[in-house]
């Protein structure tokens, strides 16, 4: 008999994903086979499973916390916004279609049966399922077709714990208002509340906790302090809140251009964890100063973001910085933008558009999306700041719709191993000042990251930093720190009791 618990929130970015990862880690530490599950995820941060399926990064890092391999069943529906009104719909790891919000709302009832079948399939293989909702269950305009909050809790017949963020203020109003807007049968599913991101003396909350418990009849299971742990974020809310300001002084400063449709900014978590690196996300041209490397990240709408670069003045700022001798790197969509030409006869209908011209490449968009995990080897000879990375093994994943062809003056950056064949990827100029690749997750390869950071150090006349830093070990420590804090501040025994009292056969 499988046990389950679902975390829902009073709003987006209250910490559901991180707390769900913490529960996965706790149950894993306690010897239970545990899997995460989120029926529908809207995010531009995605990853690839070993069998080439695309899913949300949040469920990938939750699976890592649970000590298991990510499985697309943990996130059967992924929505990737392509504009303010449209999103790409990814079902069971493969692109299905593009839809606007109204069309998707009408489409959702058809997904219920498939989602339930996937959930039941997953539940048969694990002792515990930790479910995560999206946004808030009190979105009363979406209630009738809900498949991700109370609608999913009903399908799974599981109890709900409500997570509220005190850091943004109004936590008791958020708790009370959320519960008040639920139907009685939905409120009855809520068995506890966790107050998250508290700073200060928790004794100041005691009277408020007593009152909210009296008003709602729902116990507060704990108050989680604001934690200084390095864990992935599900979407761009953290960027909007300047979580990654990176004010601490470090030897190396890397600027990442914060594109309107930025995707997979989790590419840079391992880079930010380096002890001598400061990451800055840049939105304005005047902020692009005193940097050692500029990175154009992935994008869900390459041509729209390329137009924004030009309209905002960021394109001129990037080109000026490059002329001053600062290397510029592009990943996936950013790689496409660095080229001479982008040909789109598939998505936008814009035809041929000029890129930034730092790489002599031509990119043609395609109908089919490439989604695969790959092992690769950096080219045997690389120039400039990349020289120390020559010949190093790296690992990552591809998520792109298009092919980039190198022209005169560009060299292949690396060789991928795909289906038993060697495939060229990426481009680098003779001076090394422009470098692009389709490979996401590149900086998770410790030796590569240290080599290129030391290459940047050498450009500044700094000695190389020899370190045994391992990003995989770093992530494991963060999961353990999170679990330890949750055991200290949340009544985990009560959560076990809640699950046992609502245990359902699968």
Curated annotation (Swiss-Prot):
Keyword GTP-binding (UniProt): no
Keyword annotations from UniProtKB, A to Z: Cobalamin biosynthesis, Glutamine amidotransferase
One of the GO biological process terms: cobalamin biosynthetic process
| One Pfam family linked to the record | CbiA
Is 4Fe-4S there in the keyword field? no
Ranges for the GATase cobBQ-type domain? 251-448
Pathway participation: Cofactor biosynthesis; adenosylcobalamin biosynthesis
The Gene Ontology terms for molecular function here are: ABC-type vitamin B12 transporter activity; catalytic activity
Kindly identify the residues recorded as the active site.
Answer: 332, 440
Q: How does it assemble?
A: Homodimer.
Q: What does this protein do?
A: Catalyzes amidations at positions B, D, E, and G on adenosylcobyrinic A,C-diamide. NH(2) groups are provided by glutamine, and one molecule of ATP is hydrogenolyzed for each amidation.
Which family is annotated? Belongs to the CobB/CobQ family. CobQ subfamily.
Protein name (record): Cobyric acid synthase
The source organism is Salmonella typhimurium (strain LT2 / SGSC1412 / ATCC 700720)
Lineage here is: Bacteria, Pseudomonadati, Pseudomonadota, Gammaproteobacteria, Enterobacterales
